[in-house]
């Protein structure tokens, strides 16, 4: 098939992964990015691959779905995973990155690549005249697609968008935190300083914080959009509304932590994670929120150690838009009625940084196979990548976005003890992925 010239709309994680991978494969790539001409409500810098919700790419453990997915991407030579690994900051068993350094490195690599032409302007319409300029189009506009491109895409697919809201956690300066109260430490680690700064709370202090959280003023949504929260980025106040102890079994859980100032386990703990290598800025883990700025300024200061904290960025809410992929897309992740238009990233219904990278990489592999008139089977659904792709391909009564977890892969056919199940999932995934890598992917590379 004659595929040489490819346009990508959107310079986020998925779009950048597509651009770098396709350029490596030898395609001529035109990457459109609307910044700095136009910013979404959640983006702040003109850099490509900007991380807006958190600087964490989550666990590196192979006994987790996300850890497996990252390892599979590394073995597929993902450009963005390679950059992330070089920009990592201490985060225990997780992979967190210096977000500015990460985005700068991605931007520099794309701007200097001879096979990539970066155009800094909004693509407002998927018109016939635009489509005719390229052999293939990849829409990787992310969950914050501009109204213009959203309306154009909606016209093409003839179906309404679904909406849910993502919340961003506040960031504070490290030197404004009271270290006579807070302490460094990671759960269950006895030695070393630890990768998280912990603010311990007594029962009484937690009650005051919890009560204020429930009463805090929230930002209201557009009246015409239904509010649907993604479970993995649930606003802290929405979690609190589920019950007094919900936070204690979630982001504020104290298990595995001992306060060195008292020698006791706190009743609750708010953890802060470094935003950069020198740990000068930290984000409030699990505190993504739609509280108004004044409410945040008051309520988060109730946490012990944060009474005089300096906010670098308050938390905020933004719309997340995605399509009903199983209904709209082919197995090539292309529109059923416009097969020259492919979709990649969070707009397809994958949720999360690594998942967006994975989707972009997979679309690139699909286009390589198409250009060689070859078919490629996607990885087995027992693998992390295969399970994620199965989710956005398999019809369901109410399709919702998802990040990768073991609930997306087939359950064991034999009886496995609960404590051994994650290890079993990981071993099965590794075996099946290697088999696919050496028996399927090798034929198109």
Curated annotation (Swiss-Prot):
Main localisation: cytoplasm
Source taxonomy: Bacteria, Pseudomonadati, Thermodesulfobacteriota, Desulfovibrionia, Desulfovibrionales
A single MF term (Gene Ontology): flavin adenine dinucleotide binding
A Gene Ontology cellular-component term: cytosol
Reaction(s) this enzyme catalyzes, per UniProt: uridine(54) in tRNA + (6R)-5,10-methylene-5,6,7,8-tetrahydrofolate + NADH + H(+) = 5-methyluridine(54) in tRNA + (6S)-5,6,7,8-tetrahydrofolate + NAD(+); uridine(54) in tRNA + (6R)-5,10-methylene-5,6,7,8-tetrahydrofolate + NADPH + H(+) = 5-methyluridine(54) in tRNA + (6S)-5,6,7,8-tetrahydrofolate + NADP(+)
Family: Belongs to the MnmG family. TrmFO subfamily.
Function recorded in the entry: Catalyzes the folate-dependent formation of 5-methyl-uridine at position 54 (M-5-U54) in all tRNAs.
Family annotation (Pfam families): GIDA
Record key words, sorted: Cytoplasm, FAD, Flavoprotein, Methyltransferase, NAD, NADP, Transferase, tRNA processing
One Gene Ontology term from the biological process aspect of the record: tRNA wobble uridine modification
Name the record gives this protein: Methylenetetrahydrofolate--tRNA-(uracil-5-)-methyltransferase TrmFO
Top-level division of the source organism's lineage: Bacteria
EC number: 2.1.1.74
Cell compartments where the protein resides: Cytoplasm
């Amino acid at each position: 098939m004659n595929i040489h010239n490819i346009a990508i709309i959107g310079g986020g994680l998925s779009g950048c992964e597509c651009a770098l991978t396709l350029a490596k494969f030898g395609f001529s790539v035109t990457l459109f990015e609307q910044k700095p001409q136009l910013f979404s409500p959640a983006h702040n810098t003109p850099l490509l691959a900007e991380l807006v919700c958190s600087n964490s790419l989550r666990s590196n453990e192979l006994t987790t779905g996300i850890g497996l997915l990252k390892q599979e991407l590394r073995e597929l030579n993902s450009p963005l995973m390679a950059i992330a690994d070089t920009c990592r900051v201490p985060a225990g068993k997780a992979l967190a990155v210096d977000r500015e350094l990460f985005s700068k490195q991605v931007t520099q690599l794309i701007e200097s690549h001879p096979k990539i032409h970066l155009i800094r302007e909004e693509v407002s319409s998927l018109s016939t005249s635009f489509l005719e300029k390229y052999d293939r189009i990849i829409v990787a506009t992310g969950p914050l697609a501009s109204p213009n491109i959203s309306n154009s895409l909606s016209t093409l697919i003839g179906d309404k968008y679904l909406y849910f809201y993502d919340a961003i956690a506040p960031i504070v300066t490290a030197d404004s935190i009271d270290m006579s109260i807070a302490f460094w430490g990671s759960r269950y680690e006895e030695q070393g300083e630890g990768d998280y700064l912990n603010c311990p709370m007594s029962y009484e202090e937690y009650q005051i914080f919890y009560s204020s959280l429930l009463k805090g003023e929230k930002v209201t949504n557009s009246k015409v959009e239904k509010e649907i929260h993604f479970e993995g980025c649930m606003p802290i106040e929405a979690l609190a509304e589920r019950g007094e102890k919900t936070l204690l079994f979630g982001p504020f859980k104290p298990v595995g932590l001992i306060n060195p100032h008292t020698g006791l386990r706190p009743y609750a703990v708010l953890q802060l994670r470094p935003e950069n290598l020198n740990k000068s800025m930290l984000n409030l883990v699990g505190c993504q929120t739609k509280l108004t700025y004044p409410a945040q300024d008051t309520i988060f200061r109730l946490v012990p150690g944060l009474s005089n904290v300096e906010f670098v960025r308050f938390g905020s809410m933004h719309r997340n838009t995605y399509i009903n992929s199983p209904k709209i897309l082919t197995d090539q992740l292309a529109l059923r009625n416009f097969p020259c238009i492919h979709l990649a990233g969070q707009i397809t219904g994958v949720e999360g940084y690594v998942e967006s990278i994975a989707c972009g990489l997979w679309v690139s592999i699909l286009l390589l196979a198409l250009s060689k008139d070859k078919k490629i089977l996607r990885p087995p659904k027992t693998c992390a990548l295969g399970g994620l792709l199965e989710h956005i391909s398999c019809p369901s009564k109410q399709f919702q976005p998802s990040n990768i977890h073991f609930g997306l892969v087939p359950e064991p056919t034999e009886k496995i003890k609960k404590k051994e199940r994650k290890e079993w999932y990981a071993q099965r995934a590794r075996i099946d992925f290697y088999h696919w890598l050496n028996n399927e992917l090798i034929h198109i590379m």
